[in-house]
Amino acid sequence: MAFEVCRHRHDARWIVRLGDAVYGSYLDKEQALLDAVEAARDALQAGREAQVWVRERSDSARIF
């Protein structure tokens, strides 16, 4: 499973996506990242593979 941290299209807020599902609405990227990493760690503890990606306009980066 891949958690994606990105900006919401309609405003300046950050969101966390997992597939087609959208979680949260964050004022800054740091809070979105913290929640995404926590969710990925929970998934790993449950025996599932998990990654966290930051998607920005010009590039993407895997951070966890």
For the regions a language model picked out, list residue spans one by one.
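Short aromatic-glycine-(Arg/Gly/Cys) micro-motifs in beta-strand/loop hairpins
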Residues: M1-V22
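A short, exposed loop/beta-hairpin motif centered on an aromatic-Gly-Thr core
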Residues: L18-L33
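Short, mixed-charge low-complexity intrinsically disordered segments
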Residues: L44-F64
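Compositionally biased, intrinsically disordered low-complexity regions
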Residues: I15, G24, S58-R62
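Charged, amphipathic alpha-helical segments
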Residues: M1-A2, E30-E38
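Low-complexity, intrinsically disordered/propeptide-like segments
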Residues: C6, A21, A36-V37, G47
